[in-house]
Amino acid sequence: MNQRNTIITVRLLAAIAIGLSSAIAAKPEQAAAVPLTEAGQKLEAKYAAMLKALEEEIATALPKIEGAQQAAFLKAYEAEAAATTADRNAMHAQNKSKDKAEAAKAGASAKEALARALANAQAPAQAVLAQLNPFLTSDKLDAQLVKLVVLAEATPRGLAEFAQQGKEQEALLEKLLADADLMKQMVVAAGASGGKYGQAMQIFTDIQKASSRGKDDILQRFALGTSLEHAVPVVQRNAVARTDAPTTVDPVKRYLHYEKAYLAGELDPGFKDLSVWDCRFVGNGDEPDEMLAWGREMLRNYHPDHIQTADYRWRYVEAVKTDVKYGSQDQKNDLPTLGFYQNIINTGGVCGRRAFFGRFILRSFGIPTLARPQPGHATLVHWTPAGWVINLGASWGWGTVVGEADTDFLAMTQARMAEAAYPEVLRAQWAGTALGEKKAAGFGAAATGFWNGVALYRQRAIIEKAKAVTLAAVGTDIGEANESKEKEVVKSVTVSEADKKIVAGPDGVITIPAVACSKPTDSTPKIRFMKSYLGGMQMHYSRMGNAEPFEYTFDVSAAGKYSLSVRVATVSPDQRLLVFANEAKEPIDIAAPYTIGKWDKTPPVEVALVKGKNVLRFTRNEPVKGLAIKDFTLTPVK
């Protein structure tokens, strides 16, 4: 096989597809091609010459596989890719078919065919991988390979369009093309969105000018991931009333926002361990920066247990389960002055809005996440230290991530976790790029060429050696429902004497911690006690489950009228509490302010207390929305 015949023509016609990195976030409409000036034409010729020289050098340097052996490998790869697609299609068909028996029979046949294809591929794949092992495990050719990938994905024309803008832009590209380590970081992280490497380099440079901290460790990786992802601007989703707000996210400000949050200890502890590739899917959201800050503050105040849970599958994103009502009937009440995500937790939504909110709250705390649509339903996937997990959807195999089979995305993420070995996969992909192959995301895509097949079989070997564990989907049964059918175990919470101490000041003011209940004395499905970011503990009264009263028993030294106010956090308007003081026959209505996730106090109401023992009994009229309570203040009425 003559591997160089079609190289140059392919390169000059179009950029190689850049797979899972492109079209991740909402992008503006692509601008028309920029005409090249005379200087731009010379630059294009210069970059094309660089690319051609690298293609020739790499084609010569790549190890050769004997023709018959290569043909056998390709035949096995093509058969497995076709069988994988057929198996997936048969699985999906069973869900749609009216003739379930026939569909099940076809599904079983497809699985048998896939098993045969897998078995038939083992020998040719192992033989080829063994021969190519010295190349795959060596970084000797990396500098040339990564430079070629940058030139190929950006295209000489695209680079020239950027460089012709001025000496500064041309110098930035020269600096990038001379920095093998930086180019390698970029292409290992799946390259610049839209192949816009010049724009990515500009953003990265601007970030480093704006912050001296964006040069080391996680902050350098986050700066680079942000630069790559925002090379094609991300459309910003503003409050409807904010007609003067920027239309796209400012990537430098986005970086600085996360830098500040990280240094303040506001992000997830796992953030510091993210790769450049992971970081792309943290800072790529459509929300304004102030909305990210709101997301963190809201959850700290309103539902801190979602931050504190050890279960990474549900950390942060459990807010969808507990507080984003399923149904679109209230969306007419969205407020133009509120941000999109503030409206979602207030008025709810069907699968799309719930998945949007889930991804938003994960990004707010620095957790990588992506959309994962499946037929007729919107779900999400997100990072955990143990691997990526699906929320609110069916198991792996039923959806797509960035337009590719979710199982292909899963395999790629599992291989990426083996950081030392994963470059072996990439070297094979880079070799394929050098020889004009289209990148294949996985076996769920059509076979594209010899080297991409090598990459996929190497990836599989890495996954098997690592004994990677696939995390099961969670929240499948609440994807289109309000309450789970799974029985929830409510964990017992220890409330210390200090946390439930009722304090009477010298001025007669009494402060009752929300967790100082005489009934209930432990968390229930409706009433949860949890640690508070204000110190001590707080209560959350859930929107789900049956109504449940709660009481406080305390002593008062002087009888009389007292002004009662409650410190609350709400994410929906029109919240109310009803309080019975001692033996009162009728409750007093307490209106809770719409705090949009902040702490605030209710307008005071008067209650009559007796000297000695008193009981305040609170209840709510269902249906209700969630309500966080920190404490109650009773002030003597003069």
Please give the residue ranges for each predicted region.
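Bacterial N-terminal signal peptides that target proteins for export
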Residues: N2-L12
